Amino acid sequence: MRIGHGYDVHRFGEGDFITLGGVRIPHKHGLVAHSDGDVLLHALSDALLGAAALGDIGKHFPDTDPRFKGADSRALLRHVVAIVAEKGWKVGNVDATIVAQAPKMAPHIETMRGSIAEDLGVAVDQVNVKATTTERLGFTGREEGIAVHAVALLMAR
């Protein structure tokens, strides 16, 4: 059994929606990123890679590589799952915490869980996503961006 932790942050910029957990959410800003900016899937990918001692998404999908410009983070996550499986691991469960003042995440959580479960090849009850605010403190509280913490449990195949 292995446990990994992932963390990612993206700042708000131009746009009228964000993508989190593979779900498009209307918002007054977009997220600035080299890929599609799905901070939730980036943190989950890092947690999975960390648990398998395979580095991080920057190593596998560098933002200096034009192939990943605007990349679909769901495709990147599925690739991470394949890399982890090649090393003899399968996902036991994942848990993520979205830290954001806005937009409200509650209406989208179940859809995120389903999308993530599909990409991980696991049941929805092996995926947990929750959200919190920082009571208007820090960069997330000032609505400058979004952060996500994620943990993943891997089990031998």
Swiss-Prot record:
Cofactor(s) the record lists: a divalent metal cation
Protein's name in the database: 2-C-methyl-D-erythritol 2,4-cyclodiphosphate synthase
Cofactor binding note of this UniProt entry: Binds 1 divalent metal cation per subunit.
Family matches, as InterPro entries: MECDP_synthase, MECDP_synthase_CS, MECDP_synthase_sf
Top enzyme category: lyase
Organismal lineage: Bacteria, Pseudomonadati, Pseudomonadota, Gammaproteobacteria, Pseudomonadales
BP GO terms, sorted: isopentenyl diphosphate biosynthetic process, methylerythritol 4-phosphate pathway; terpenoid biosynthetic process
Quaternary structure and interacting proteins, as annotated: Homotrimer.
Key words of the record: Isoprene biosynthesis, Lyase, Metal-binding
UniProt: a divalent metal cation binding residues: D8, H10, H42
